[in-house]
Regions:
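Low-complexity, polar/amphipathic intrinsically disordered segments that mediate membrane, lipid-surface
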Residues: 1-5, 62, 66-67, 82-86, ...
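Conserved G1/Walker A P-loop phosphate-binding module
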Residues: 3-78
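Conserved C-terminal guanine-recognition region of P-loop GTPase G domains, centered on the G4
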Residues: 34-38, 50, 57-71, 81-139
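Canonical P-loop GTPase G-domain recognition
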Residues: 56, 76-77, 117, 124-172
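Long, hydrophobic, amphipathic alpha-helical segments used as structural scaffolds
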Residues: 170, 233, 289-292
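N-terminal targeting leaders of membrane proteins
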Residues: 171-189
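Membrane-inserting effector segments that mediate pore formation, membrane fusion
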Residues: 183-284
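Charge-biased C-terminal accessory regions appended to nucleic-acid-, cytoskeletal NTPase
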Residues: 269-329
Length: 329
């Protein structure tokens, strides 16, 4: 088949499978709803064991210091469990040692149905694991050695991941208020989107619909990650991003045709269509926003990311501009 005829086929496939502007608008509306979740009121309890070191308590306290007006932070210092627990709290964190008073307080908080995480001070606690095992306590905790940077980083990641998983209804508000929650939440979004797109890509009866579904999922991922880092996405940016993203996920039909123009191994194409591309794009977005990237640079970031990946950009370029034009129409 002549080259021009093949490109005509590409154009017809693009028009058939690229999501409609209305679908992209719906994604934008969903992202706008998510953005509003950032303003939800947060009620956080912080219990500090008087036996814990100042270094450990300072490290954890500083994580929750914020100027965000919708956050209520209650800090209580304790020697025993004779403290008041606000049952309306969204979550609680205990900074403590391996003492019975910490365990008693944990049970008291759990009785109030308030999710609780314990940060044990490694400088004053001897053997936390055996301490908890003896009391048949299975729970969420980590050991912090406040003088070690790696230990502090691990604690932040574990605590941030815990908050994102436990405080599901308010996870975007937590990410907006406390930066250490942002990356774990963003990576969770990337992971879930990659899994969903992988499932879409391998279902046979979705062969005519998988392109727009995967594209819309990736656009939604982009919007959610941007929201996590306090960035606002508008419809025009979504359309522009769609033009870049669709060139990367066009595997089956389009690449079968373009592959006759510029040969590509089948395993490269299929690997990119689902898990690979979504992971690459998602991680690039997270790193970009973590470094303070602005929303205006997102489209250029996507272009560079896809060109530098194993997408085999040489095959994408002949149709990328046509795809982008179709999406904007």
């Amino acid at each position: 088949m002549p080259r021009q005829s093949r490109l005509k086929q590409v154009n017809s496939i693009v028009k058939k499978y690229v999501p409609k502007t209305e679908d992209i608008k719906n994604v934008g509306a969903e992202i706008a709803k998510i953005s509003k979740l950032e303003d939800m009121t947060l009620n956080v309890l912080l219990f500090v064991d008087n036996h814990a070191s100042n270094e450990a308590s300072t490290v954890v306290r500083n994580l929750f210091m914020t100027s965000v007006p919708n956050v209520r932070l209650q800090i209580c210092y304790f020697d025993n469990n004779d403290v008041n627990v606000d049952r309306s709290a969204d979550m609680a964190v205990i900074i403590g040692c391996d003492t019975s008073s910490v365990v008693d307080l944990l049970f008291k908080i759990r009785e109030m149905a308030v999710p609780c995480y314990i940060v044990f001070d490694g400088s004053t606690s001897s053997s936390v694991s055996s301490f908890l095992a003896e009391r048949e306590i299975a729970g969420d905790y980590c050991i912090l050695n406040p003088e070690e940077k790696e230990s502090v980083a691990i604690m932040k990641k574990k605590l941030g991941t815990w908050i994102a998983n436990v405080c599901v209804g308010k996870k975007f508000a937590f990410a907006a208020a406390f930066p250490f929650v942002a990356r774990p939440l963003a990576m969770e979004i990337v992971h879930l989107t990659a899994i969903e797109n992988t499932a879409v890509g391998i279902v046979p009866f979705l062969s005519k619909a998988d392109f727009p579904i995967m594209l819309l999922n990736q656009l939604c991922m982009l919007g959610q990650i941007a929201t996590v880092y306090g960035k606002k996405i508008d419809l025009n940016l979504l359309k522009e991003a769609a033009g870049v993203l669709v060139a990367a996920i066009f595997g089956k039909k389009v690449f079968k045709i373009t592959n006759k123009i510029i040969p590509l191994p089948a395993f490269v194409i299929s690997g990119v269509v689902a898990l690979g591309t979504t992971e690459v794009i998602g991680r690039a977005l997270v790193s970009y926003f973590e470094a303070g990237g602005d929303i205006d640079g997102v489209v250029e970031l996507l272009k560079k990311t896809l060109e530098g990946s194993k997408v085999a950009s040489a095959a994408v370029k002949p149709i990328a501009s046509k795809i982008a034009a179709t999406v904007r129409a």
